[in-house]
Design a protein with these regions (language model features):
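N-terminal Rossmann-like dinucleotide-binding module
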Residues: 1-55
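C-terminal helix-rich "cap/oligomerization" subdomain common to oxidoreductases
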Residues: 1-10, 75-80, 223, 295-299
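Beta-loop-alpha module in the N-terminal Rossmann-like domain of NAD(P)-dependent dehydrogenases
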Residues: 25, 55-118
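A contiguous active-site-proximal alpha/beta segment in oxidoreductase catalytic domains
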Residues: 83, 106-167
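Hydrophobic residues in well-ordered beta-strands that form the structural core
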Residues: 101, 126-128, 157, 230, ...
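Mid-domain beta-loop-alpha active-site segment that forms a flexible
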Residues: 129-137, 160, 164-201, 209-215, ...
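Contiguous beta-strand/loop segments that form the cofactor/metal-binding neighborhood of enzyme cores
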Residues: 186-266, 290-299
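C-terminal helical cap and adjacent loop that interface with cofactors, partners, or active-site loops
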Residues: 275-299
């Protein structure tokens, strides 16, 4: 007699928040054979209805407590608004769930440091979606720099200005644009420098007389002497007839330079080193959430 049995080795996950980012994660996990999306939770009835249509094999719930209390759920994906994230991370740790979180990890800097302390004092795995480290263009540029092609790394300049969300269009819980989108560039600049920030100065503009700065420029130094400047804002011509944006990375060494620009569809990398001059033009690649999910599964 032949006896066959199959064991589901996929990672069981509950998605909390089925808005734009939650759906990105659902799509990436659905395309992978490594994830079992057991639950989808959202407090909005329309989002739950959409989840039922898109994911008939998942349990669709309004109360996330059901996900946390299910001992078979190994991972929670926290993709709601920032003001609820700290409480959800705290609950995930209490119930022994690994964590994939959107940024920012809380609604204020004080709460963010509390979350950092909580996650560092547990043996659970937690990650935040700072996807630029997984992008092909940044990895290409960093590899070129490590080959010594531009000499000693000296200056890192990053700019990302888009029309983006104006105040009142859904960004209030995440705080000023720099507190959310800007963290990508704070992170990737530090990644290039390879050490912690030492000094910084910043200025902001309260566009449209809004209470928070919607444009910020920050510059300073790293502990190894590398200098940086970061410019970020959702202020770039919201009412233009034909909207545009300005996004670039410009890294200067003692002997050469590397730079990148993109239009959200195509990224162009120019590498000007002592031995090679290379130009690479490829699809931008989006948010690389599939890469994040695979790396998390590997962990």
């Amino acid at each position: 007699m032949n006896t066959q049995s199959s064991v589901d080795t996929r990672i069981k996950v509950g998605i909390i928040g089925f808005g734009r980012m939650g759906r990105f994660y659902w799509e990436a996990m659905t395309k992978s054979d490594r994830w079992n999306i057991a639950y989808i939770c959202d407090t909005d009835p329309e989002s739950r209805q959409l989840a039922k249509e898109l994911a008939p094999g998942s349990l669709i719930v309004e109360d996330n407590q059901k996900i946390f209390e299910d001992e078979s759920v190994q991972v929670v994906g926290l993709f709601t608004l920032a003001d609820s994230r700290m409480g959800q991370i705290e609950k995930a740790i209490r119930y022994g769930k690994h964590i994939i979180s959107e940024k920012p990890i809380a609604d204020t800097m004080e709460n963010e440091w509390k979350v950092v302390e909580m996650t560092e004092n547990t043996n659970l795995i937690s990650t935040v979606n700072l996807y630029l480290r997984n992008s092909w263009y940044h990895n290409l540029m960093k590899e070129y720099i490590q080959q010594g092609e531009i000499g000693e790394l000296a200056i890192i300049r990053i700019c990302h200005m888009t029309p983006g969300l104006a105040p009142g269009e859904g960004h209030e819980y995440e705080g000023p644009a720099f507190h959310d989108c800007g963290m990508h560039y704070v992170d990737i600049t530090r990644w290039y420098a390879g050490c912690d920030y030492r000094t910084w100065n910043a200025q902001g503009v309260n566009m449209w007389n809004y209470k928070d700065p919607w444009w910020v420029q920050c510059h300073g130094t790293f502990q190894n002497g590398v200098v940086f400047d970061i410019t970020q804002g959702f202020v770039y011509g919201q009412l233009s007839k034909d909207q545009t944006h300005n996004s670039y990375v410009d890294i200067i060494g003692t002997k050469g330079v590397v730079r990148m620009t993109h239009d959200f569809n195509t990224a162009v990398v120019d590498l000007h080193g002592v031995n090679q001059t290379i130009r690479v033009e490829k699809p931008f690649g989006g948010k690389n959430i599939d890469v994040l999910c695979d790396l998390f599964a590997d962990s």
